[in-house]
């Protein structure tokens, strides 16, 4: 998407909804087409000396434009002012930052199904020979399951499929296990030898199955939401 000047881009952005910002830039939503427009911070800083600005290239943001994946959200098009890349366009991923969701509100049946679907996305990513990066704080979760955003630092790799898939899956699984356990159930997990070992290394689906089973056994009834196990909570500072 090409704009002749900063002013023309700013005028265009005024028609959109500002939905937030991160370390890389500011995001705007176009509700009409369901797209996100991400504008890099450098673009707004007129006082930043040119030598300190990042010179982005088209290739950085179009390398995955033909990749189809239901879990990972990739840039589809770049935004340029003149000859300068100042942002990119991607589809809108509905959901909230997983790190900011209260785990007690999650239906564990639905969560289990959504993890399974996300694992299919991880598998496809690995088949496409793409190495993920910085997954932990870039996971959204909502009615459409897991969506992983801010994928611009991902890269194609020659790593063999098994090793690549293991690495990509571990990045995702670690985030899920942290979400389920961190600060609330650390003490409970640490008292269960098998759970403790699985928390370190296991697939998040396998861990969740046993975690839920152990909670249910301890309480004497089926745990559907983690809030059902609130009597087992011991508030601990996360050290992972």
Give the positions of each predicted feature.
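Conserved kinase catalytic-core helix
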Residues: 100-140, 146
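Conserved hydrophobic "DFG−1" position in protein kinase catalytic cores
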Residues: 29-30, 92, 140-142
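C-lobe/activation-segment region of protein kinase-like
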Residues: 141-240
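Conserved structural core of kinase catalytic domains
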Residues: 68-114
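Protein kinase-like catalytic core scaffold
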Residues: 35, 71, 88, 147-150, ...
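Well-ordered, non-membrane alpha-helical segments in soluble/globular domains
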Residues: 48-61, 114-116, 165-174
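ATP-binding glycine-rich loop module of kinase domains
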Residues: 12-78, 102
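A short, low-complexity linker immediately N-terminal to eukaryotic Hanks-type protein kinase catalytic domains
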Residues: 1-15
